[in-house]
Amino acid sequence: MDPQNYSLVSEFVLHGLCTSRHLQNFFFIFFFGVYVAIMLGNLLILVTVISDPCLHSSPMYFLLGNLAFLDMWLASFATPKMIRDFLSDQKLISFGGCMAQIFFLHFTGGAEMVLLVSMAYDRYVAICKPLHYMTLMSWQTCIRLVLASWVVGFVHSISQVAFTVNLPYCGPNEVDSFFCDLPLVIKLACMDTYVLGIIMISDSGLLSLSCFLLLLISYTVILLAIRQRAAGSTSKALSTCSAHIMVVTLFFGPCIFVYVRPFSRFSVDKLLSVFYTIFTPLLNPIIYTLRNEEMKAAMKKLQNRRVTFQ
């Protein structure tokens, strides 16, 4: 299409989760409560890890604190706007705001994928090589793992936004989701996006699939090692691994389903995106603290310290 014959789109229309006014009122209350719970739960983990010397000196809890920080960002890139849009008849987002959503989703999402692999490696060393744990999971190693997750997330998001922001958007501007989902946005471009879809598969799909396979291998090795131990000594390790596997499944399953097939869309995709953008950040604090006696003891200590100061 000749650039002289069209005007560029300056904003996009988001369809949201539903069109029913009654459901939107319910979703406003529900997701507002969920978002508050996400922020408070992850903030509590972050503050507990930072304030407790035993926790913030442990590689496992250092990584967990970083996961809580990323979850707060992952839940905040689109959820506040979605909540506000439940009360609005027109769900508009500017072009710049749309690109920002794509950037922060892939930045935090990519970083969290790599961080979850690092946490699986930490559990592998703790369970399979306990005598070498402090050597293999030194502070230098932990910092490198966290920095690697942030660098991968940043490079991944830049690579996604770089080709998306320069596409010509001149026709339809309606996105059938509650945020600017990359596969839906590039389909609005006034050009053939088949090659871009292939690029997206080799980027988002490859990142999520490779991290997921690494996690599967790690936890398979861990579970096999646990089975070889005496029954009485495996309960804590098995509980920890089960919690991690649950997080991995809830986070990676929807991501892989959505991003490895950008040329086809299903109505369930919109609901699946709720899992990795909202429910995973909500469940992480619960899963990682529910059976973790050290974390619960540190939280009680933090609460007692607060009562003492009052």
Curated annotation (Swiss-Prot):
The entry's protein name is Olfactory receptor 4K14
Intervals, Cytoplasmic compartment: 50-58, 122-140, 221-236, 291-310
The domain of life is Eukaryota
Gene (name only): OR4K14
Ranges in the topological domain labelled Extracellular? 1-25, 81-101, 160-196, 260-270
The residue ranges crossing the membrane are 26-49, 59-80, 102-121, 141-159, 197-220, 237-259, 271-290
Sequence similarity: Belongs to the G-protein coupled receptor 1 family.
GO annotation, cellular component aspect: plasma membrane
The record's subcellular locations are:
Cell membrane
